[in-house]
């Protein structure tokens, strides 16, 4: 999977820019706040219809513009594709794949995949469960269209149920709607558990190897998927998962109505990460957490490659500058085989070390 060219109009600080990329290594350097991360953000957005940092599409439209356009030429699966997204301030976005209108972002995810790694990801191990769920969701939504659809529906049901519980004090009759919402949530929740368990097992397999190699064989990383307590075996058949999720939700009905909050379901899932048997979130050093985060991201890349037969586009946003020389070398020795984009600062030696095509970004212009 490779990005051949990218065109941006009124996206962030890019008023109008067209650029062609190297099929292997692209190094983007420049001072801070010039547009390096914005460029990577556009590549990620065109792969999945979601920004790794913006909460709304409007945030990505240039301040003085009514709309923004992102368009890319892509090579994947021995074919060439053209994807286009138009973002608007006052209406829904529009998307196309090869000039055919796309109903939703799932159409973008079927063209190419990205693995985005930024400095915040180095703290993935120590953050709360929401960060690790987001990590799973981002990967699985690109890989599995059924997962993306189930997640969107689960979130919709969760939001509705939350409003019902919140408003039930003034309108107790709303509680009559809960059984239907609960039943649909457990059915879509079972789909989430099924795919998350598969992803966590693959992640554990690959990340453990990367972590062992980076630590010189001194440490053992283990990743375990954690869902609601009533699910005794996340690998069970769908109907079994549904029944166990249903039992958990029924046992929490009283507490949910009392607290007016959704307390049961896979929206509380987590990845439990241990190093030598000790939970990394609480006991690992800064160096250990960074090594573990690197292992997770490299494992994510391998999962994509095994699922699709091609490496995803790898985007390293100012990550290498945050690492010591040993970890820098470890990453650079493991990114061959696919297209990579690496951002760095003006005074960084990475452009000289990496080769490939070098781009200088200044005030939203790429030279």
Residue ranges, per PLM feature:
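Conserved NTPase motor "head" modules and their coupling/switch loops across ABC/AAA+ ATPases, GTPases
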Residues: 1-31, 172-313, 322-326, 330-333, ...
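Walker B catalytic acidic pair
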Residues: 317-319
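Long, charged N-terminal accessory/stalk domains
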Residues: 123-124, 130-179, 183-186
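Structural recognition of the conserved hydrophobic beta-strand(s) that form the central parallel beta-sheet
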Residues: 72, 339-346
């Amino acid at each position: 999977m490779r990005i051949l060219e990218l065109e941006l109009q009124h996206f962030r600080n890019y008023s109008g820019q067209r650029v062609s990329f190297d099929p292997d290594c692209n190094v983007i350097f420049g001072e801070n706040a010039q547009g390096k991360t914005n460029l990577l953000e556009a590549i990620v957005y065109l792969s999945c219809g979601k920004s790794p940092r913006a909460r709304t599409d409007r945030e990505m439209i240039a301040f003085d513009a009514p709309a923004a356009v992102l368009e890319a030429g892509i090579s994947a699966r021995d074919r060439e594709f053209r994807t286009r997204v138009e973002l608007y301030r006052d209406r829904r976005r529009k998307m196309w794949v090869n000039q055919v209108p796309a109903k939703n972002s799932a159409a973008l995810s079927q063209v190419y995949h990205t693995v985005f790694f930024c400095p915040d990801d180095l703290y993935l191990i120590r953050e709360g469960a929401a960060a690790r769920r987001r990590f799973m969701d981002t990967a699985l939504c690109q890989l599995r269209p059924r997962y993306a659809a189930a997640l969107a529906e689960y979130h919709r049901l969760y939001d509705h149920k939350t409003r019902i519980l919140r408003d039930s004090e003034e309108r107790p009759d709303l509680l009559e709607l809960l059984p239907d919402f609960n039943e649909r949530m457990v059915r879509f929740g079972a789909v989430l558990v099924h795919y998350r368990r598969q992803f966590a097992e693959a992640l554990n397999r690959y990340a453990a190897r990367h972590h062992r190699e980076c630590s010189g064989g001194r440490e053992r990383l283990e990743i375990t998927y954690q869902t609601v307590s009533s699910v005794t075996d996340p690998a069970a058949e769908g109907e079994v998962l549904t029944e166990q999720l249903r039992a958990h939700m029924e046992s929490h009905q009283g507490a949910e109505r009392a607290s007016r909050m959704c307390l049961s379901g896979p929206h509380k899932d987590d990845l439990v990460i241990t190093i030598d048997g000790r939970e990394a979130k609480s006991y690992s050093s800064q160096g250990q957490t960074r090594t573990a985060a690197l292992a997770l991201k490299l494992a994510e890349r391998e999962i994509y490659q095994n699922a699709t037969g091609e490496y995803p586009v790898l985007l390293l946003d100012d990550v290498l500058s945050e690492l010591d020389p040993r970890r820098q070398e470890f990453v650079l020795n493991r990114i061959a085989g696919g297209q990579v984009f690496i951002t760095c600062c003006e005074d960084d030696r990475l452009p000289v070390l990496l080769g490939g095509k070098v781009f200088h970004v200044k005030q939203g212009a790429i030279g």
